[in-house]
Amino acid sequence: MGDETSPLNLGTVVSVRGSVVDIRFDDDLPSIHTILRANEGEIVLEVLAQHDARHVRAIALTPTQGLARGMAVQDTGGPLKAPVGKGSLSRMFDVFGNTIDRETALSDVQWRSVHRAPPPLARRSTKSEIFETGIKVIDVLMPLERGGKAGLFGGAGVGKTVLLTEMIHNMVGQHEGVSIFCGIGERCREGEELYRDMKQAGVLPNMVMIFAQMNEPPGARFRVGHAALTMAEYFRDDEHRDMLLLIDNIFRFIQAGMEVSGLMGQMPSRLGYQPTMGTELSGLEERIANTDTGAITSIQAVYVPADDFTDPAAVHTFSHLSASIVLSRKRASEGLYPAIDPLQSSSKMATPSIVGARHYGLAQEIRRTLAQYAELKDIIAMLGLEQLSPEDRNVVARARRLERFLTQPFFTTEQFTGHKGKLVSLKDALDGCERILRDEFKDHPESALYMIGTIDEAKGKAKPPAPATPSEPDSKTEARADPKPAAESPAKAIPGPHPQSGAKPQPETDHAADTHES
């Protein structure tokens, strides 16, 4: 496991309360973060507090079954260590550095402490570069920073893990450096599926995976992020390679810290969180940095409890990120995948000096159009689309086409949706948005833009409709000049405007409501 045994220093278990163990040492008192072993090395503990000159309080990193009062505990003399080096590539580890992929024994690695200081300010790089993901809505509206930190915020079941897995699929193949996936308190099934997918895709040779699953003690979940960063720092500082660090889920790190804090008897703060949450999160996040030798780019899934973005865990995480990608349950229910809310999401890279004047101008125009549509939705729901001015109706048409163009079929969900995955370059994504804003596709049905890659696919997906047909969306105004036909056959107008093109249901509530209005 990588721990170096020091001269024997034995202690005795005084009390066991769940994962917290009090131990008495009569000779040398172990220092903070020292690893202790009991029950013939099967039970691993980490010292978190020194009560007095004889007693320490430790948190268990393994289950404590079999541990009893009076049992001997051995001081290993060192902290928790992680394996670093080329021998760790293509392997899967637990928090102790043990391989869990049933492959050959580990070789060609060094062992380093997981407790390391962030790089000093003098070593940090201030150069700003864009990191392309191949996902249209992210690259256009909230570009990621090379060497930065991006968070995927969302409640349960809105697609955080799917989006993170798709980014792995898209970026690991074109990313020249090393990728590390760190699973903190997530499902064992997801780790197994990810390992198999990466192996089949042929990207495992440049990837390291490390897990502490939700069934493990809070101490293990609390330390696995530090172990992953230790591995990433080796490739950045020693190998001078760029790193891609993917964390699922950073909230589970905070949650594990809350459990540890409660077990240690600390006074809780707001909503039961630990009083040291800000310090603990900073100790992890500040190690993710862009230096003169290389960069660690991090993408982190962040679970938001009960979709409450004012939760202290979400608020503290927001402050460390260069890009915040917010996933919306409403958009997911409408079938607009990826369910990213373009108005709540943001990136500090979206400035003219970094992305260029054209990209910045297009992004602002897209946000403005979508924001106007969001304001008009209440009026449409109450009065109908025909009560809007012609200019507002054009805004609604552009916004709905933009929303559908910014959907994208994922490689990782092909087997569920039936749509073949698409990887779209930033240039193609910008061209598509620009052409929609110029009303180049106003004669195409909205469904032609749904779940496509580049904008040219829309032309092959659906031919422009005949101009005089009452069921077409762009002829709706003319068709309703005479209210009688609409009143006589309201049902006919509902399915006509938007023929479905995929497995997911298309959101057509606005137009369906409009037909009954007249």
Swiss-Prot record:
Belongs to the ATPase alpha/beta chains family. This is ATP synthase subunit beta 2. Its main location: membrane. It is found in: Cell inner membrane. SUPFAM superfamilies: C-terminal domain of alpha and beta subunits of F1 ATP synthase, N-terminal domain of alpha and beta subunits of F1 ATP synthase, P-loop containing nucleoside triphosphate hydrolases. It comes from Albidiferax ferrireducens (strain ATCC BAA-621 / DSM 15236 / T118) (Rhodoferax ferrireducens). GO terms for cellular component: plasma membrane; proton-transporting ATP synthase complex. It catalyses: ATP + H2O + 4 H(+)(in) = ADP + phosphate + 5 H(+)(out). GO terms for molecular function: ATP binding; ATP hydrolysis activity; proton-transporting ATP synthase activity, rotational mechanism; proton-transporting ATPase activity, rotational mechanism. Residues 455-518 are annotated as: Disordered. HAMAP family: ATP_synth_beta_bact. It is an enzyme of class 7 (translocase). Its EC number is 7.1.2.2.
